[in-house]
Swiss-Prot record:
Function: Implicated in the mechanism of induction exerted by cellobiose.
Annotated signal sequence range: 1-27
Positions annotated as active site in the UniProt record: 110, 149, 295
Species of the source: Streptomyces halstedii
Enzyme class: hydrolase
Bridged cysteine pairs (disulfide): 112-156
Name the UniProt record assigns to this protein: Endoglucanase 1
GO biological process: cellulose catabolic process
Keyword Membrane: no
InterPro entries on file: Beta_cellobiohydrolase, Beta_cellobiohydrolase_sf, Glyco_hydro_6_CS
Length: 321
């Protein structure tokens, strides 16, 4: 069904409700406004495959990774963020596809881990950046993963820093609800081995989860979908018991095809997981991390930087060795 026809049908179906109270700005369902997910033609895997057509690994990387819909990450490297986010959302919209975007620029990013340290120069700089991010997407349908690791990275932070971070996330949700009404925003909730369900439920709630569409799990990690689903349900049980609501969640399945070996930073022998789809035990299973992109200078990516595409790692991940 074409985008225009779906939009017209939705409008016609809504006519009997014309005098009902307006739904909240973030209530639109972008999955019904599009026809499948957007595969980024300029992902690191796509660029490598295009630049190395004679490499014996290129065909497999192109077929199994580059052509799979996955997220594009946005941060300080993205230039004018409103323009960058708008161009990406617009390209997907032009193909009637749903894009997945990751906002990864919070002030004091990866403060305790360090492998991906950086982010905006100050809380006010981040507020401006995230407002422009949301404004760039505008009314186009999109999925946004909001600041991976931001609620798990508390181990070395003092209470004032935690309050500051939660305030930045709450403000980000306000911006998306005001400016991007057809975007589903998922606050990142780390992974099942980072914080217990009760702790994560509290952190999510205090950072404004009620204003978000849901939360994300396992971003850039390797833990099985089953373990993440059990954890997501446990977080929701805590949310229901403590605060009276639950939220849908998504799981990053890009690199969890054979689970975790206990290491999180470029472990060997990992395998790609279920390609991006709706359902599957969560609201969506998404490729949020690009398989083959380094976690940092560690493991089988020794000597690399976070985000660098490593073709040999990508190739081996297709087959799990």
């Amino acid at each position: 069904m074409s985008r225009k026809l779906r939009t017209l049908m939705a409008a016609l179906c809504a006519l009997p409700l014309a005098f009902a109270a307006a739904p909240p700005a973030h209530a639109a369902d972008p999955t019904t406004m599009t026809n499948g997910f957007y595969a980024d033609p300029d992902s690191s895997a796509s660029r490598w495959a295009a630049a190395n057509p004679g490499d014996g690994r290129a065909a497999a990387i192109n077929a199994s990774i580059a052509n799979t819909p996955m997220a594009r990450w946005f941060g300080s490297w993205s230039g004018a963020i409103g323009t960058a986010a708008g161009a990406y959302a617009g390209a997907a919209d032009g193909r009637d596809k749903l894009p997945i975007l990751v906002a990864y620029n919070i002030y004091n990013r990866d403060y305790c881990g360090g492998h991906s340290a950086g982010g905006a120069a100050s809380p006010s700089a981040y507020a401006d950046w995230i407002a422009r991010f949301a404004g760039g997407i505008a009314a186009r349908p999109a999925v946004v993963i909001l600041e991976p690791d931001s609620l798990g990275d508390y181990g070395c932070m003092n209470p004032a820093q935690i309050d500051e971070r939660e305030a930045m996330l709450t403000n980000a949700l306000v911006q998306f609800n005001r400016q991007a009404p057809n975007t589903w925003v998922y606050m990142d909730a780390g992974n099942p081995r980072w914080a217990d369900a009760a702790t994560m439920a509290r952190r999510l709630h205090e950072a404004g989860l009620r204003q978000a569409h849901g939360f994300s799990l396992n971003v850039s990690n390797y833990i099985t979908t089953a373990e993440n689903t059990a954890y997501g349900n446990a977080v929701n049980n805590e949310l229901a018991a403590r605060y009276g609501y639950t939220k849908p969640f998504v799981v990053d399945t890009s690199r969890n095809g054979n689970g975790s070996n206990g290491e999180w930073c470029n472990p060997s022998g990992r395998r790609i997981g279920t390609p991006t789809r709706t359902g599957g035990g969560a609201e969506m299973l998404l490729w949020i991390k690009t398989p083959g992109e380094s976690d940092g200078n560690c493991g089988v990516g020794s000597g690399s930087t976070a985000g660098q595409f490593l073709p040999e790692v990508a190739y081996k991940m297709i087959y799990g060795y």
